[in-house]
């Protein structure tokens, strides 16, 4: 739906006839007409219409004493600064003049607009006004100047560093105004990320006092910036780290979720240094704010749940195990439900297992297919994690088999493979359902799991040979995953039972895998089994294939090193993806300006290639002006050559033309040498 702001007549389609009308309004002698024309121009610009043709007329209104009009013109200039920087450079004298105005708003606007012009020419004009703005008496100007230093550094790093702008920016960290401090910290952090080896922003203990003072006085954006800078603070002194964390703890009560998670980040970075008592105190303070985030919008809930997942892996006892806040609500989006199921599984223990099983049993009857599948998987994980409820979980699985709903039956079969690896004695409960279940299996994962069950427990399942034979009859049409499982299953069947029919089944599968299959993995495994199944190796094969399998356990945690790295990336995409930043953003961070510069470079390269092609074309057109009287081109007729092979004495232009000449149809008969002019006319 289009917002009401854009439904007014001002935002209707921008017609060509309106251009002349706006031009007249922009140069009107009446101020109210000029203001109205600028507003209409910006309205058209806001909805994506190209009004850059009005740039000269809009620029004329820059030299005005009307603050409202000047702000509108600056807004127009900032919008076109990235796409039309060469036009904006025309107004640089006005920018420099405005940077010395008595009004701090105008001074800040001038500095901000000059920083938005992304051409190297602007640096010479920007340097002196920016140097003055960094020491301006008004904090609003200093705040804008701090951000402008980053933009200058992005344009020319050497110039910015050699002219003392970095040192002036570092001095702003001690500014009495908290907003200026926040902007200075953010700018230094961004500069440091571009050149970490130069160490422009290293947070030390002497800096933390000023940051703490600013932390309690600035808005939420400033707090997030300062908290992220405190997360950069590294120390081996426990007292210093405790002081920082104690000052950060009150930020847990902030209403903004970004501030809360940034405070959590600071705590998690420093918490390995502390004693168990202080660690317990910090986790106790951290838990309620994290749970409060689950009552916010769904998008914030998702980010909170992904970060809670990481914290739970580090500290499983942070929450009360009987809390119901992680139970799924009927109106939760699917992505929230999926994350909550993971948390429920992580919190499952003997104290809350009955309530957890009852809740998961209720989820099985939901209508969302993916949610039900994930619930069944969670039931299997709970069975592995809490052995006391294995009978309850298998009872739920058998109830699902009774329902005979295809996708549920298939997911249960996949889970049962894992459950039976730890509880093989429970296979007896599954026996009455195997013949009926196998007909419902279409998912490759489920069919391969069923093949594993039939092979692993072939000595217990009376119909294992028959069921495997039915699956093998369609082996050629199965996925590789199923073919590998069937191959292993029939080998187990043969080694455990040793019946004649089973031997025939094994030979049938081996023959297909070795002689008919084109997959190298399947053939290699078949060759290995074929050598193992020779009479002299039967006992060795039984020890290898039918050996006792190691018990499985529930472990869904990330590697310790990866977990510690991700806990230091809370409030970033890395903590949501559960991946290190370099795995999805590359080795460097690229902003919109860097991408735009790269696009311009590619356009310049393409344009240079076009010019080069045009120049080559011009040379070809001037071929008739060349001197073709080269002796090699008129060689004696007794020196036969083929028409497809240029003469050694011809020049490069003639080589080009003769390369396009059709080859001779009679290679046995030598072709007389022709002059270069004949070759040219022969085209």
Curated annotation (Swiss-Prot):
Adaptor protein complex 1 (AP-1) is a heterotetramer composed of two large adaptins (gamma-type subunit apl4 and beta-type subunit apl2), a medium adaptin (mu-type subunit apm1) and a small adaptin (sigma-type subunit aps1). AP-1 interacts with clathrin. It comes from Schizosaccharomyces pombe (strain 972 / ATCC 24843). It comes from the Eukaryota. One of its GO terms (biological process) is retrograde transport, endosome to Golgi. Belongs to the adaptor complexes large subunit family. GO terms for molecular function: clathrin binding. The keyword Transcription regulation does not apply. It is a peripheral membrane protein. One of its GO terms (cellular component) is clathrin-coated pit. Its main location: membrane. Residues 632-649 have a biased composition (Polar residues). Adaptins are components of the adaptor complexes which link clathrin to receptors in coated vesicles. Clathrin-associated protein complexes are believed to interact with the cytoplasmic tails of membrane proteins, leading to their selection and concentration. The AP-1 complex interacts directly with clathrin. The modification Phosphoserine is found at residue 675. Keywords: Cell membrane, Coated pit, Membrane, Phosphoprotein, Protein transport, Transport. This is AP-1 complex subunit beta-1. The keyword Signal does not apply.
């Amino acid at each position: 739906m289009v917002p009401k702001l854009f439904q007014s007549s001002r935002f209707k389609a921008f017609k060509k006839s309106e251009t002349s009308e706006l031009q007249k309004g922009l140069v009107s002698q009446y101020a109210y007409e000029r203001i109205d024309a600028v507003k209409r121009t910006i309205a058209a610009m806001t909805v994506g219409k190209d009004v850059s043709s009005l740039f000269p007329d809009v620029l004329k209104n820059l030299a005005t004493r009307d603050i409202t009009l000047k702000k509108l013109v600056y807004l127009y200039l900032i919008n076109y600064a990235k796409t039309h920087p060469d036009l904006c450079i025309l107004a640089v004298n006005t920018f420099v003049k405005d940077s010395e105005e008595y009004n701090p708003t105008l001074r800040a606007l001038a500095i901000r607009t000059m920083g938005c012009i992304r051409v190297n020419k602007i640096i010479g004009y920007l340097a002196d006004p920016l140097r003055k703005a960094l020491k301006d008496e008004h904090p609003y100007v200093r705040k804008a100047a701090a951000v402008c230093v980053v933009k200058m550094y992005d344009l020319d790093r050497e110039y910015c560093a050699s002219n003392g702008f970095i040192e002036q920016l570092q001095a702003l960290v001690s500014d009495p105004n908290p907003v200026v401090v926040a902007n200075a910290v953010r700018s230094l952090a961004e500069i440091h990320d571009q050149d970490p080896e130069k160490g422009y922003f290293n947070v030390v203990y002497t800096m933390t006092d000023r940051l703490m003072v600013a932390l309690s006085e600035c808005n939420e954006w400033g707090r997030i910036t300062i908290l992220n800078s405190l997360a950069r603070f590294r120390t081996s002194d426990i007292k210093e780290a405790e002081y920082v964390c104690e000052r950060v703890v009150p930020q847990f009560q902030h209403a903004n979720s970004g501030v809360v998670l940034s405070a959590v980040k600071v705590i998690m970075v420093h918490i390995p240094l502390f004693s168990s008592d202080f660690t317990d105190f910090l986790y106790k303070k951290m838990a309620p704010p994290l749970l409060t985030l689950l009552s916010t919008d769904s998008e914030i809930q998702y980010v909170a749940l992904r970060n809670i997942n990481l914290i739970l892996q580090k500290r499983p006892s942070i929450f009360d195990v009987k809390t119901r806040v992680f139970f799924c609500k009927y109106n939760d989006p699917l992505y929230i439900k999926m994350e909550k199921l993971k948390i429920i599984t992580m919190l499952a223990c003997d104290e809350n297992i009955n309530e957890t099983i009852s809740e998961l049993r209720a989820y099985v009857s939901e209508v969302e297919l993916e949610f039900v599948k994930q619930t069944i998987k969670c039931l299997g994980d709970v069975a592995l994690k809490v052995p006391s409820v294995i009978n309850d979980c298998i009872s739920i699985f058998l109830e699902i088999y009774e329902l005979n709903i295809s996708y549920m039956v298939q997911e249960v079969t996949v889970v049962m493979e894992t459950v039976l690896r730890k509880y093989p004695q429970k296979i007896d409960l599954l026996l009455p359902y195997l013949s009926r279940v196998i007909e419902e299996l279409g998912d490759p994962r489920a069919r391969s799991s069923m093949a594993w069950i039939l092979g692993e427990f072939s000595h217990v399942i009376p119909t294992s040979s028959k069921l495997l034979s039915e699956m093998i009859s369609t082996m050629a049409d199965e996925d590789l995953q199923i073919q590998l499982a069937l191959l292993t299953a029939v080998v187990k069947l043969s080694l455990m039972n040793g019946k004649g029919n089973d031997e025939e089944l094994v030979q049938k599968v081996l023959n297909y895998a070795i002689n008919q299959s084109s997959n190298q993995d399947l053939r290699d495994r078949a060759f290995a089994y074929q050598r193992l199944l020779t009479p002299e190796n039967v006992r060795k094969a039984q020890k290898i294939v039918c050996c006792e399998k190691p018990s499985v356990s529930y472990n869904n945690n990330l590697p310790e090193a990866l977990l510690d790295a991700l806990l230091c990336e809370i409030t970033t995409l890395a903590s949501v993806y559960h991946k290190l930043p370099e795995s999805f953003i590359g080795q460097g961070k690229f902003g919109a300006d860097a991408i735009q510069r790269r696009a311009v470079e590619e356009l310049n390269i393409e344009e240079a290639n076009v010019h080069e092609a045009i120049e080559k074309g011009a040379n070809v057109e001037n071929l008739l002006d060349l001197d073709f009287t080269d002796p090699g081109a008129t060689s004696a007729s007794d020196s036969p050559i083929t028409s497809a092979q240029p003469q050694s004495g011809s020049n490069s232009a003639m080589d080009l033309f003769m390369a396009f000449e059709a080859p001779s149809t009679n290679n046995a008969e030598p072709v007389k040498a022709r002059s270069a002019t004949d070759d040219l006319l022969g085209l």
